[in-house]
């Protein structure tokens, strides 16, 4: 399977923002929005106790842009300032609050649909070509669908992704790795700044310590998870929730733009069921 990384995601987000706005500062803000993503990405949010919002690493965005002479020179050459591009949250086409649709959510949803769920590129193009910029309930720009049948295809892919993002396997693996990184910090094997290099660097540090190396190799042997109401004795287990990412896009109807859940009862029911999971169960590793 091809690997998606923050760089690819950022390029795609910027391209989508440019496609719908032709605004340079919005597009560059989209390009740079993940510049502060650390090694293992959202695992560090779990390490920071920010597993419900998953925004803890964004605080370094402005500093990382400002500390790059090359980026600052390019911004100046383009007539842009640091304030123009250091926070993509201010541009609703680039980013907005869930369950709205933005370039950020659109990019990773379509990317995962293709690389993880093997959705054909032609289908992704049908989805993308159906999207336009409209005004939402608060009269703010938002990406919308022109046709309900295309919105239906997109939302089924989106919901499948949402379930994957908070699956027992995902939550457990994120928390287990976060706990391993926490132990590495406690043993003075790595620092916070080490996390802002890359995964091979962090892994090399883990392998440099016999205790952590054994834990890392054990982590790599995990093939799945088991779950139950009771915590098994003598077994590492977690009971943890996570940020539920979901999309309920606007779709054009004869009555104007409406949220898809108001025009499609099946999706409304499935989305409600997804949101109802309280993660009230213990999860532990399964090995071959």
Across the structure, where does each feature detected by a protein language model lie?
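Histidine-centered, transition-metal-coordinating active-site segments
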Residues: 1-25, 39, 43, 48-288
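Short alpha-helical catalytic segment bearing the HExxH-like zincin motif
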Residues: 26-34
